[in-house]
Curated annotation (Swiss-Prot):
It is found in: Cell membrane. InterPro entries: UPF0478. The lineage of its organism: Bacteria, Bacillati, Bacillota, Bacilli, Bacillales. This is UPF0478 protein SAOUHSC_01855. Belongs to the UPF0478 family. Its main location: membrane.
Length: 163
């Protein structure tokens, strides 16, 4: 049985050697994977730096656009305020026109009889003025014709006598 112990030692040494070879193989495989991961991370790092630069540029552009839009909004606010003021003025004007219209309508309805009398009197006055003008015109026309007839008669008589 003495020989079992050295054989067991040899078997244990061989097993340990196989175990070490397996561990070395696994470690080599892990090393290859880690090298691949390192290369991939280097590529990703470069891409991330590129993305970071582009993102920074985009943020600067967005900030400039935001400032531009803010300036335009501020200018537009003054326009909106002006339009609101115009709207308020138009509304006030409409209210004033409504009040004046209502006042006129109310006054007309209260003074309807007086207005009717004024219209009747103005019609009478216009008729009198027309009759006065017609009468004056007829008188002027009659005198004109009478004077012309006498003048024409004298002129005709004297012209015949002189000849």
């Amino acid at each position: 049985m003495d020989w079992i112990l050295p054989i067991a030692g040899i078997i244990a040494a061989i097993a340990f050697l196989i175990l070490c070879i397996g561990i070395v193989a696994v470690l080599n495989s892990v090393k290859k994977n880690l090298d691949y991961v390192a290369k991939t991370l280097d590529g990703v790092e470069g891409q991330v730096q590129g993305i970071t630069r582009e993102t920074t540029d985009l943020l600067h552009k967005v900030n400039r656009l935001t400032e531009d839009i803010q300036g335009k909004v501020d200018r537009l606010n003054s326009v909106v305020d002006a339009v609101k003021g115009i709207g308020d003025s138009v509304q006030t004007l409409n209210s004033s026109v409504d009040r004046v219209t209502n006042s006129i309508t109310h006054n007309i309805s209260q003074n309807e009889d007086k207005i009717s009398q004024v219209v009747q009197w103005s019609n009478v006055a216009m008729e009198i003025a027309d009759k006065w003008q017609n009468r004056h015109y007829r008188r002027g026309s009659a005198n004109y014709k009478a004077n012309n007839v006498a003048t024409d008669a004298n002129h005709s008589y004297t012209s015949r006598v002189d000849k």
